[in-house]
Amino acid sequence: MAAIVIVGAQWGDEGKGKATDILGGKVDYVVKPNGGNNAGHTVVVGGEKYELKLLPAGILSENATPVLGNGVVINLEALFDEIDGLEARGANASRLKISANAHLVAPYHQTLDRVQERFLGKRAIGTTGRGIGPAYADKVARIGIRVQDIFDESILRQKVESALDIKNQMLVKMYNRKAIEPEQVVEYFLSYRDRLRPMVIEAELELNQALDEGKHVLMEGGQATMLDVDHGTYPFVTSSNPTAGGAAVGSGIGPTRITTSLGIIKAYTTRVGAGPFPTELFDKWGEYLQTTGGEIGVNTGRKRRCGWYDSVIARYATRVNGFTDYFLTKLDVLTGIGEIPICVAYDVDGKRYDEMPLTQSEFHHAEPIFETMPAWDEDITGCQTFEELPQKAQDYVLRLEELSGCRISYIGVGPGRDQTIVRHDVMQDQ
């Protein structure tokens, strides 16, 4: 059987958790292939609202085995706090499986993340301060600590001491902070060893064997395309590859086994943190989208920057991810606003760009070129089929589909699991 990958098509917070929750009940495994506890999901099940950070949204699907893949960086304290919080509400979160090759976020990663952001001041990237970037940096520098390392105390101690030889020089001499004792870090990791042990698996083997047996695997990407370290608005990006290609790398599932690439995209656009945002609104409509859409970051609590739909970004995301389908979310937020602007191209210093500009400098100077469509006034939160939507809402969806270069198979008309219109069920393609 083949695999499905879910990818955010904008700057995150598109509603990937809802998509995973809906499809997660139809698959055997739900895998988070990248990121850490810096990417939040909000899932509404049975009227209950769940805010997830490190765990995949599939943790709430009883039929699926949730997996943290090798591309994830794991903060063990955050992991077990999240598990305990879910189980206190009746969820069976202890069935989680974790790749032995996933990297761990150490206390010194978090310290360095916060110190470096303060040091940069106005030049700060706007990270969550959770140590994700420094953990990925150590992974690439080959001085990272993996899940498997905490089961061999001598290796763990050696790796921690080697890492702190470098980190303490930075903390003391560059940032005027106290050195971190290696033993404190070792004890921190060892305190979670026994609880972690039954969860650890050779994920690459188990997932590929599951596919060989005809089972379904869903990969739930964190963050989004425009935050990808290679394809996003660098340097205002995350430290991993939350695109379809990154899902293959971060799970150990080969790219030829992925048959459906499902992009999650809002009916408008949002962004958290610093960085260019061509359609950003600074007027009453920005406040309206923020308030009506509930645009507050799950992880940071920061208000999201809001703007109109950007089809240039959508086309770019379609291209770099090879999207086969789109899941459009929050269509209901646009009800009753009169006219809806859609960005169809950019103007950069008097030149029209229908696709992404070549350089980030040009993107920073991009001004949106809009076309407008009439909004609808009818309540759409109870619509179950595309035909039940008002004609103006149908027209808007079809125009986004045309501009984005990919069919829109799912439409979110409210936060609930059942408030989703299915035009095409991607599970039928498997």
Curated annotation (Swiss-Prot):
<keyword id="KW-0436">Ligase</keyword>
<feature type="binding site" description="in other chain">
    <location>
        <position position="302"/>
    </location>
    <ligand>
        <name>IMP</name>
    </ligand>
</feature>
<comment type="function">
    <text>Plays an important role in the de novo pathway of purine nucleotide biosynthesis. Catalyzes the first committed step in the biosynthesis of AMP from IMP.</text>
</comment>
<feature type="binding site">
    <location>
        <begin position="298"/>
        <end position="304"/>
    </location>
    <ligand>
        <name>substrate</name>
    </ligand>
</feature>
<dbReference type="InterPro" id="IPR018220">
    <property type="entry name" value="Adenylosuccin_syn_GTP-bd"/>
</dbReference>
<dbReference type="InterPro" id="IPR042109">
    <property type="entry name" value="Adenylosuccinate_synth_dom1"/>
</dbReference>
<dbReference type="GO" id="GO:0044208">
    <property type="term" value="P:'de novo' AMP biosynthetic process"/>
</dbReference>
<dbReference type="InterPro" id="IPR001114">
    <property type="entry name" value="Adenylosuccinate_synthetase"/>
</dbReference>
<dbReference type="GO" id="GO:0004019">
    <property type="term" value="F:adenylosuccinate synthase activity"/>
</dbReference>
<feature type="binding site" description="in other chain">
    <location>
        <position position="238"/>
    </location>
    <ligand>
        <name>IMP</name>
    </ligand>
</feature>
<keyword id="KW-0479">Metal-binding</keyword>
<feature type="binding site" description="in other chain">
    <location>
        <begin position="13"/>
        <end position="16"/>
    </location>
    <ligand>
        <name>IMP</name>
    </ligand>
</feature>
<comment type="subunit">
    <text>Homodimer.</text>
</comment>
<dbReference type="InterPro" id="IPR033128">
    <property type="entry name" value="Adenylosuccin_syn_Lys_AS"/>
</dbReference>
<feature type="binding site" description="in other chain">
    <location>
        <begin position="38"/>
        <end position="41"/>
    </location>
    <ligand>
        <name>IMP</name>
    </ligand>
</feature>
<keyword id="KW-0460">Magnesium</keyword>
<feature type="binding site">
    <location>
        <position position="40"/>
    </location>
    <ligand>
        <name>Mg(2+)</name>
    </ligand>
</feature>
<keyword id="KW-0342">GTP-binding</keyword>
<dbReference type="InterPro" id="IPR042110">
    <property type="entry name" value="Adenylosuccinate_synth_dom2"/>
</dbReference>
<dbReference type="InterPro" id="IPR027417">
    <property type="entry name" value="P-loop_NTPase"/>
</dbReference>
<comment type="pathway">
    <text>Purine metabolism; AMP biosynthesis via de novo pathway; AMP from IMP: step 1/2.</text>
</comment>
<feature type="binding site">
    <location>
        <begin position="330"/>
        <end position="332"/>
    </location>
    <ligand>
        <name>GTP</name>
    </ligand>
</feature>
<feature type="active site" description="Proton donor">
    <location>
        <position position="41"/>
    </location>
</feature>
<dbReference type="GO" id="GO:0005737">
    <property type="term" value="C:cytoplasm"/>
</dbReference>
<dbReference type="GO" id="GO:0000287">
    <property type="term" value="F:magnesium ion binding"/>
</dbReference>
<feature type="binding site">
    <location>
        <position position="304"/>
    </location>
    <ligand>
        <name>GTP</name>
    </ligand>
</feature>
<keyword id="KW-0963">Cytoplasm</keyword>
<feature type="binding site">
    <location>
        <begin position="412"/>
        <end position="414"/>
    </location>
    <ligand>
        <name>GTP</name>
    </ligand>
</feature>
<keyword id="KW-0658">Purine biosynthesis</keyword>
<feature type="binding site">
    <location>
        <position position="13"/>
    </location>
    <ligand>
        <name>Mg(2+)</name>
    </ligand>
</feature>
<feature type="binding site" description="in other chain">
    <location>
        <position position="223"/>
    </location>
    <ligand>
        <name>IMP</name>
    </ligand>
</feature>
<dbReference type="GO" id="GO:0046040">
    <property type="term" value="P:IMP metabolic process"/>
</dbReference>
<dbReference type="Pfam" id="PF00709">
    <property type="entry name" value="Adenylsucc_synt"/>
</dbReference>
<feature type="binding site">
    <location>
        <begin position="40"/>
        <end position="42"/>
    </location>
    <ligand>
        <name>GTP</name>
    </ligand>
</feature>
<feature type="binding site" description="in other chain">
    <location>
        <position position="128"/>
    </location>
    <ligand>
        <name>IMP</name>
    </ligand>
</feature>
<keyword id="KW-0547">Nucleotide-binding</keyword>
<feature type="active site" description="Proton acceptor">
    <location>
        <position position="13"/>
    </location>
</feature>
<comment type="similarity">
    <text>Belongs to the adenylosuccinate synthetase family.</text>
</comment>
<feature type="binding site">
    <location>
        <position position="142"/>
    </location>
    <ligand>
        <name>IMP</name>
    </ligand>
</feature>
<dbReference type="InterPro" id="IPR042111">
    <property type="entry name" value="Adenylosuccinate_synth_dom3"/>
</dbReference>
<feature type="binding site">
    <location>
        <begin position="12"/>
        <end position="18"/>
    </location>
    <ligand>
        <name>GTP</name>
    </ligand>
</feature>
<protein>
    <recommendedName>
        <fullName>Adenylosuccinate synthetase</fullName>
        <ecNumber>6.3.4.4</ecNumber>
    </recommendedName>
</protein>
